[in-house]
Amino acid sequence: MKPTIIIAVYKNTTALEAIFKSLERQTHTNFDVIVAEDGRSKEMNDFLSGNSYGFPILHLTQEDNGWNKNAILNKAISASKTDWLIIIDGDCVLHERFVEMHLRFAKKRRILAGKRVKLNQELSELLLTDFSSIIKLPQRLLKHLL
């Protein structure tokens, strides 16, 4: 099964780059990506057109008329060409088995929902400035949770 990963974003290219790097590390690699931008920023357009990743990316935008995330998500859902959708926010770095696990539990007429782990400011900044630290993230999280 091939999913489409829809990423809802608003101007934060640093976080989107971290998401893309986490997508490059996925154990399941056959997926499409739609970046659903609630707005139309030059920085986002330049970032997406100036970088290449190992998966196809479709960038959808709309006018920045205040918070209108749901409208751009509806456009992204309509633009998808696959049978399974995974929708995430533009500040969620993914575990390397994120797509694999979604597909393992995917079934017709089923909706999967999950929660994210909200990181403190220090850990968030570390992930955004040194992406290699994500490899050690599970161990760091356990240390803080136990």
Predicted region positions:
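Conserved short acidic donor-positioning loop in nucleotide-sugar-dependent glycosyltransferases
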Residues: K11, L23, E37-R40, D64, ...
